[in-house]
Amino acid sequence: MGGSWFLVARFWFPVPSQLPSNNQQPKTSNQKPTSGGAKVRRPALNLNHRRRDLVGRVRFFRKNMMLFKRLLLVVQLAVAGVAAPLAARANHVLIPMDNTQKESLKAYGVAFWLLQREVPVDWLLNYRGGSFAFETVSGAENEMAVRGVTFTVISEAQYTGILQEIADPNANMDVMKLEKVPKIAVYTPKGKQPWDDAVTMVLGYAEIPYTQIYDDEVLKGELPKYDWLHLHHEDFTGEYGKFYATYRNAPWYQQQQHDAEATAKRNGFAKVSVMKGTVATKMQEFIAGGGFLFAMCSATDSYDIALAGLGVDMVESMYDGDPADPAAQSKLNFNRCLAFQNFQLERNPFQYEYSNIDMQPNERGLGEQNDYFSLFTYSAKYDPVPTMLCQNHEKTIHGFMGQTTAFRKSLIKSDVVVMGETKQTGEARYVHGTLGKGTWTFYGGHDPEDYQHLVGEEPTDLALHPNSPGYRLILNNILFPAAKKKKQKT
């Protein structure tokens, strides 16, 4: 381009060798001076010179007219080449979340990465599986490439077209602006447990940072520091997962009991069950103050059981040193529960079950080959919360077992939103509700990509399941607090 402008300059301002110079001496007449000192007739030098100068310039212009036309064409093409990208500048990035995405789970990590850098992210609800979009920012394309996330760079006009498609009143789609970086806490003991934790695994895989907390931190009142709290394979009844019958002699079980009793004593509690009930209450206060609680597996039903049984001894002697109250069932207060009501406690201390909230295998009649649950479809424009929590590229999710696998629908409170169910067995797998200024979500099962995860098994390798629809539901919940416009009040 620079060379073209140089040629144009040379054309408009020719060098001295190309044109006659005003400083050239005019040719003199061939007439010799006459004798006697007679005056010689002076030629019209100025007029002739100007004529020659004009004729020279005209000849030069004619001679180089073709060059001029060519240069003009070069300039026009160059200007058009610059103007075209400016008119259709690619200034948005679309991360599709449908079946074209190669790394669905890591895509959530990219969204989190952007929020950490104060880059707003548009969550395009129900558009191509719940895609993400954002304005281009330095380093983003490289970050996505490193993580293997599929993305497309699009123009302003293209993105405007997408937004218009979403805004159509007949389209069940909407845009949710993500602006806030959620502060995530995972409630889990410091020591290693003989089972994996789906949430910590997917957080690690997606490269989303979190803080590990447990009973000490909760009792010290540290929950208000966070926006989102996760509970996984936990027992809030103080019965150590009801593993007594099978694992009471296992070193990990004995260590777990020892650590729990030491923590209770350190915090002024005579029994672990009483401490766990207090911890559950603190978490309920966290929700009511504006927090987001997400629980899986046994942390779902055991949590509500602990709340219902506050002040009631539901625990037998092998767990707390004294017999349970025979009238414990009649003393339960279901009004304190988040999700369940009218359930019956499992009073047998050797039975690996807490209550009849969890559907039993013989009742379900399902196995790995036919265990599926369906996600509900909500109005994106009018029910954005459950819509966000159900974003997925699949609407039918393969089931997976856990200590608590599925919730008996007849025991779920009427104000609870059932987002995923297996209708033929009368069970819910994925439920949601509100309390005060906050919300909670319960998700049945232990590991979405390990149908029957057993104690002592190796953790799941999520690199083998980068587009797991079951794990996507977990990550929907993690991004959900980012859509909260107002600062959390606790």
What are these regions (language model features)?
Residues 86-197, 206, 445, 452, ...:
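Hydrophobic targeting/anchoring helices
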Residues 1-34, 40-46:
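Short, basic, low-complexity termini and linkers enriched in Ser/Thr/Gly/Pro
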Residues 91-133, 313, 409-490:
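Extracellular ligand-binding/catalytic regions of CAZymes and related secreted enzymes
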Residues 268, 308, 317-319, 326-330:
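Catalytic cores of eukaryotic secretory-pathway lumenal/extracellular enzymes that build
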Residues 197, 204, 301, 320, ...:
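Catalytic beta-strand/loop cores that center a nucleophilic Ser/Cys/Thr
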Residues 52-65:
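Short, Lys/Arg-enriched N-terminal segments with co-localized hydrophobic residues
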Residues 92-93, 98, 102, 132-142, ...:
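Helical hinge/lid and interdomain linker segments adjacent to catalytic or ligand-binding clefts
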Residues 69-83:
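Bacterial N-terminal signal peptides
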